[in-house]
UniProtKB/Swiss-Prot annotation:
Residue ranges of coiled coil: 42-104
UniProt entry tagged with the keyword ATP-binding: no
Gene3D superfamilies with a match to the protein in the record: ESAT-6-like (1.10.287.1060)
Regions crossing the membrane: none
Protein name per the record: Uncharacterized protein YfjA
Family, similarity comment: Belongs to the WXG100 family.
Superkingdom, taxonomy of origin: Bacteria
InterPro entries in the cross-refs: ESAT-6-like_sf (IPR036689), T7SS_ESAT-6-like (IPR010310)
Keywords: Coiled coil
Amino acid sequence: MDSYKVIELANKYSAAAEEVRSSKMLLESRLSALGDAWQGKARDSFDQDFEETKAAYDQFEQELLETSQELKAAAVKIEERKAEIARMEELERKAREERHKLGR
């Protein structure tokens, strides 16, 4: 498995989290721009729904970031395992060479 592909995927998750954050901030700024121009029961209902939506945005952003971090950690483990395998292969190669020398 290629750790670079895993890191690339992790970066895509981070970018998606940033897009979610930006989208939420845009919605907040547009709502703020309305100020007191929109009032009443419909506004109160909207505000309540919007608070729930913001919480969902925050949760989704957090999950994307956590997934990104987990993928990056997995990429590190992949590289560690590759290094361990390479080290073991080198030890096996040296052992074969030593056996070959002793067999002469």
